[in-house]
Structures are given as structure tokens and as C-alpha cells.
Amino acid sequence: MPGSFTLNDKEGSQHTLRRLEPSQGSETLGIYLAMDGSHADHLQSMKDKGIAFAGKIRVSNCSSNVAMYTYKYCFLPSLQYSMCVSNFTEKEWISIIAPAKKATLHKSQMVATIPCDMLYGTSKYNGFDLEDPYTRQGIEKLATFMQE
């Protein structure tokens, strides 16, 4: 793209601003945002988080309870941060969490094809109290809307 923009910092030094195409996402406050509203870069970033978590769980020497605890209280909340601004479909959420969920279930000595009713069911009905990220995304959007 022709031309460049510069910005002075508080010491007076000039810095050239990076120019991106409208479809390119740039990380802003931990979330990849593109000017045209596409979320391909953000989706890939979230998938990378899932793959990284799966790799760490797979090679760790943790117990089955610690693996499930880490998935529930560390990995899922790290995804929850961007839910109020993301607009992923249910299939996209499945592709994001699939590697992490599979590795966690394997480490917890459970079959990877365990029914979602058990995973996302409450402990009152012998479920694991995990939250479906697609449903959580909708709740986060509603909560943000109600705060506005």
C-alpha cells in the first residue's frame, strides 16, 4: 500500500504504523480483530490455543483429576475472555476445543467419544459440569448486552 503513517511517542520519537488489509486481523488486547469483521485470524489463534493446551496435557505427568481441573478452570476461562466479541458457530467451537478435550479425556482415562450430555451435564445428574463454549458465548454476549 502506498504511503505511511507515523506517530510520535511521549519522548518525541517517530514510529511508523503498520498498515494491514481490511481482511487481515491484528491482535488487540489478546483478540484478533479485522476491520471487515472476518474472524479467520481469531479462529486460528483460538485453535492454536487448543492445540497448545493439548500438547501440554499430553506430555504432562498429572493425575486424571488435575487434567480435568486444568481443562475446566484454566483452558476454558482462557477462551471465555474473547467470547463476548467473537461470533463462532457451533462447528467452529468444536474445532477449537476438540484437541484439548480429546487430550484431557485421554489423560483422565475416559473415552474421547463420551456423550456431550455427560460432559456438559450437571453433577446433580452425574455429569462433569463442563460448559459448552457455544452456549457460553451466547451467555457472555447477553451479559455484556445487559451491562450496556
Question: What does each model-found stretch correspond to?
Answer:
Residues F5-K91, S108-V111, I139-E148:
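Basic, alpha-helical interaction scaffolds
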Residues M1:
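Conserved polymerase palm-domain catalytic core
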